[in-house]
């Protein structure tokens, strides 16, 4: 083919990935795409000329015209070889730059292209710029170390500036866009200046890299020198006899292994690691890992136990001193100790104390440890979301450690402590695993004698540990909950809070705030006032904070006024210390009202009175429900409405009231969400009262779920609800008959002040709650 510079040619185009071919450059290419193979075959049949053009994106499998650069290199095919896998290996030599004017229709890329004319340089100018480029490239080669020196020799034989620029570009580690830019720059001076700028940047980077390598090498030499000197020092000390009395590190570790009395499996594993340590360089990173592993193995208590107390009377005394109430928990601990007296080897119980915040779950764990004579260790599980927190990290990880369980056992030093798993319901899981699943083995008495920590890699016996878990709710995974003996701690009664404050909290805060016992007196009435009007909680944390506030103000008053020798806090002057009352517990209404019923509610901080209001008015049968009611409570209203409709005739209500009356049911404190089925009887009573004009007795409160047949079903939280009724001045409480068995857990002073009436049918409720007997009430099941 005649390569006249002004000539336009029609030529096959071969797209290339990540490669830019320059003139005078010989390069092998591997071609696999069908269109590209067709392109080469056509070129071989004609004049063996092909235009090599780079793709803009290398990952494009089927490039279009827009995916190719406009400027490429016309090359001659020197050799073409078809490979067995269907691909083609071709050897090409770049000839001259060319620019694509437009593409023509074909099975492959066929374009009309035009040769690019490179302007010639002045001989003097060419000599100067060639010399500068070669000198800079020589400096680049010395730092790069990857380009063979022969390349520099070949460059010295090139006088033509354009060819020199292309040769340098072919050996430079440039990005594809930069290589393409070199191809597209027509002016040779500009092309070489661009390359020299690229070389300058690369030289700067290589110099920084060289400095870093030098520092690393120097540091390594320093470490090797220190190791050599340490070994020399040991040899000198040995010759002088200075180390004869000093114990050998390996002998010390072996002695610790012997003294730990670990099981055979653990001993073999530890001694195997000790032998590995002896063969390692003391300064190596692996030696540190092995030494750390051995230290953990000998620090874990394998056989050492604390002596468990078996004196039941003393244990009961300790539990009663530390905590007021909580009889069921104390009873369970004493049962365990009683059995321990008869059986020497008894697996520790796994208890789960479930109750609201502040009722003494965590402090009770410490008291149980004191009563049983066990050492106490606590592990907070709130926010734990990584399985490795329980099972540990495998030793392949850098900085790996045993799980918190083994760490705590190592710290406590005995294998039979009381282990408190605090806030077990606050665990969660993520991509790193589920810690709750890891605890399944720990809390299973049949499996925890062979607990396997990922770090230790041997079984560890946890069967002697007495596990006590605490939780605010029953929101614990089922399999985990099934392994524990759940003991529920309900909120303290007002009487229990009063006794706790008198026995523990007041004395504690008096000492903590620097008061003497004779300088402050807090009367019982003041404590009850704090409980009722300044705190709303199931526990006593808020109560303790308020008592602390009183003590602080008492200290301030005594120091500011020398005439004040002591302070007495009563209900009358409580406001001076704590400010205005923050809460107002529900109280019984003073008069009987139509359509208004007092229900009983359970909350996380105890029980409360729940007022339910109902109004009926002429309308079209619309039922309105307000007061932030949940789905279950709204369904209770629907069920109550059905019960009233089914008994309308017997109750003296027009049977078509649901078509001619609009009814509005409202539960005050609308900003507070309310839900649950236990207000069913109260809803039904309020509807009957509003529709018949029969007032509801103000001294009566009720709780119970209602069915469509009018049966009253059992509810939960009876203790808290009766305490709220007692505190609110209620005289009579109607409860489901099936809840009668729960009355045994109610304090005697509460039962004595309340008339508790178990009921099974809504008819019984209406007869007691309404001021006048409903018309035609019959005590019979509605079949």
From Swiss-Prot:
GO CC annotation, single: cytoplasm
Catalytic activity: Hydrolysis of proteins in presence of ATP
Key word Protease present: yes
Domain Lon proteolytic: 591-772
Name of a matching Pfam family: LON_substr_bdg
Enzyme Commission no: 3.4.21.53
Induction summary: By heat shock.
Subcellular location field: Cytoplasm
Membrane-spanning segments: none
GO BP terms: cellular response to heat; protein quality control for misfolded or incompletely synthesized proteins
Gene3D superfamilies attached to this UniProt entry: 1.10.8.60, 1.20.5.5270, 1.20.58.1480, 3.30.230.10, LON domain-like, P-loop containing nucleotide triphosphate hydrolases
Keywords from the named record: ATP-binding, Cytoplasm, Hydrolase, Nucleotide-binding, Protease, Serine protease, Stress response
Positions that bind ATP: 355-362
Active site (record annotation): 678, 721
MF term (GO), any: ATP binding
ATP-binding listed as a keyword: yes
Every Lon N-terminal domain range: 11-203
Subunit organization: Homohexamer. Organized in a ring with a central cavity.
Protein family (similarity comment): Belongs to the peptidase S16 family.
Purpose of the protein: ATP-dependent serine protease that mediates the selective degradation of mutant and abnormal proteins as well as certain short-lived regulatory proteins. Required for cellular homeostasis and for survival from DNA damage and developmental changes induced by stress. Degrades polypeptides processively to yield small peptide fragments that are 5 to 10 amino acids long. Binds to DNA in a double-stranded, site-specific manner. Regulates swarmer cell differentiation of V.parahaemolyticus.
Name under which the protein is recorded: Lon protease
